[in-house]
Curated annotation (Swiss-Prot):
Keywords: Cytoplasm, GTPase activation, Metal-binding, Phosphoprotein, Zinc, Zinc-finger. Residues 163-232 are annotated as: Interaction with clathrin heavy chains. GTPase activating protein that acts on ARF1. Can also activate ARF6 (in vitro). May play a role in clathrin-dependent retrograde transport from early endosomes to the trans-Golgi network. Residues 138-172 have a biased composition (Basic and acidic residues). This is Stromal membrane-associated protein 2. A zinc finger (C4-type) spans 28-51. Residues 340-429 are annotated as: Interaction with PICALM. It holds the Pfam family ArfGap. Residues 217-231 have a biased composition (Low complexity). InterPro entries: ARF_GTPase-activating (IPR051718), ARFGAP/RecO (IPR037278), ArfGAP_dom (IPR001164), ArfGAP_dom_sf (IPR038508). Interacts with ARF1. Interacts with PICALM and clathrin heavy chains. It comes from Homo sapiens (Human).
């Protein structure tokens, strides 16, 4: 091979390489496979190796196949490839190919398609002259086949336009309906009905004064300005009531005024009238008549029921037993734990468990409460409240002529002989 021929081969390879760079020549003209390296120079198309074998079977009178890299090319062959190409050849041989046609991928189907395309010229535009079509310049058919390059449009700059904001309707202020405050109902009846707290302040103070069970006498400072509704005690009785509340007055000075300051039951009830609230049937400090001490011992006071307050404070009937002796003292025999005998004796009188004698001076400093404090006469059965009991206790004198009351004196009308009977030998067998 001469130098001239070597230069031509290199030049032809360069021309084929440039033809393969075109967009239509990058794919097989028949099966659209990528990267064809074979060509049918008489038809002027680039094909893949599989389609090249089928083209060889068609015969050299229809297709002549050459390799782009392995075979030597001549100037005539290069000229045929330059005149046609895949795009121009498909425009000629696939002019009537249906748009919905799908190119086959299996070898028998591909061979049948290639034979119909080049041997039978089934999809060829027969109106065109092949030689005249070959000699046409590439620019002429490219202008009609290739899409017109889109003009580069300048980027549109969108200006920010402030949209007019919708004017919101001014919200009308909602008129809040005043909440009706219902008067608070006192279901338990604990509050006293007061018409007006400001205008009737004196009336409310009066009601509070009436509801106080122990405030039987108005204070000296407010007695002139405030008037309590209801029957109030007179000035003479008002001064004597605080003194009557003292349960332990002095024996020397108070013994002379006992007759003047003792109040009757009618005067006590008249102090309160209708304003005094009634106590329940079972009074706090009262015991029914049937709960009194047995009639065999009339000198002892009545026994309070176990459910009352005074009954709960009293000890069980174990008590103390007084035995007469030379020393004149009381020898305690038994006493329940948690109780103070002296306090009970001074506050409650004689318990039902204490047995005494008629000798004077055995229980110094103690006095028996009258039977009327603990029990009510069966014929009367009146209900007393706390204030009435206080008035009765205030009017009593716990001291006798010698400064103390003899323990053996009977409050229920019994004599000394009945008290001595309690120490009979039969009681302790």
């Amino acid at each position: 091979m001469t130098g001239k021929s070597v230069k031509d081969v290199d030049r032809y390879q360069a021309v084929l390489a440039n033809l393969l760079l075109e967009e239509d020549n990058k794919f097989c003209a028949d099966c659209q496979s990528k990267g064809p390296r074979w060509a049918s120079w008489n038809i002027g198309v680039f094909i893949c190796i599989r389609c090249a074998g089928i083209h060889r079977n068609l015969g050299v009178h229809i297709s002549r196949v050459k390799s782009v890299n392995l075979d030597q090319w001549t100037q005539e062959q290069i000229q045929c490839m330059q005149e046609m190409g895949n795009g121009k050849a498909n425009r000629l041989y696939e002019a009537y190919l249906p748009e919905t046609f799908r190119r086959p991928q299996i070898d028998p189907a591909v061979e049948g398609f290639i034979r119909d395309k080049y041997e039978k010229k089934k999809y060829m535009d027969r109106s065109l002259d092949i030689n005249a079509f070959r000699k046409e310049k590439d620019d002429k058919w490219k202008r009609g086949s290739e899409p017109v390059p889109e003009k580069k449009l300048e980027p549109v700059v969108f200006e920010k336009v402030k949209m007019p904001q919708k004017k919101e309707d001014p919200q009308l202020p909602r008129k809040s309906s005043p909440k009706s405050t219902a008067p608070v109902m006192d279901l338990l009846g604990l509050d006293a009905p007061v018409a007006c707290s400001i205008a009737n302040s004196k009336t409310s103070n009066t009601l509070e004064k009436d509801l106080d069970l122990l405030a039987s006498v108005p204070s000296p400072s407010s007695s002139g300005s405030r008037k309590v509704v209801g029957s109030m005690p007179t000035a003479g009785s008002a001064g004597s009531v605080p003194e009557n509340l003292n349960l332990f007055p002095e024996p020397g000075s108070k013994s002379e005024e006992i007759g003047k300051k003792q109040l009757s039951k009618d005067s006590i009830l008249s102090l309160y009238g209708s304003q005094t609230p009634q106590m329940p049937t079972q009074a706090m400090f009262m015991a029914p008549a049937q709960m009194a001490y047995p009639t065999a011992y009339p000198s002892f006071p009545g026994v309070t029921p176990p459910n009352s307050i005074m009954g709960s404070m009293m000890p069980p009937p174990v008590g103390m037993v007084a035995q007469p002796g030379a020393s004149g003292m009381v020898a305690p025999m038994a006493m329940p734990a948690g109780y103070m005998g002296g306090m009970q004796a001074s506050m409650m009188g004689v318990p039902n468990g204490m047995m005494t004698t008629q000798q004077a001076g055995y229980m110094a400093g103690m006095a028996a409460m009258p039977q009327t404090v603990y029990g009510v006469q069966p014929a009367q059965q009146l209900q007393w409240n706390l204030t009435q009991m206080t008035q009765q206790m205030a009017g009593m004198n716990f001291y006798g002529a010698n400064g103390m009351m003899n323990y053996g004196q009977s409050m229920s009308g019994g004599n000394g002989q009945a008290a001595n009977q309690t120490l009979s030998p039969q009681m302790w067998k």
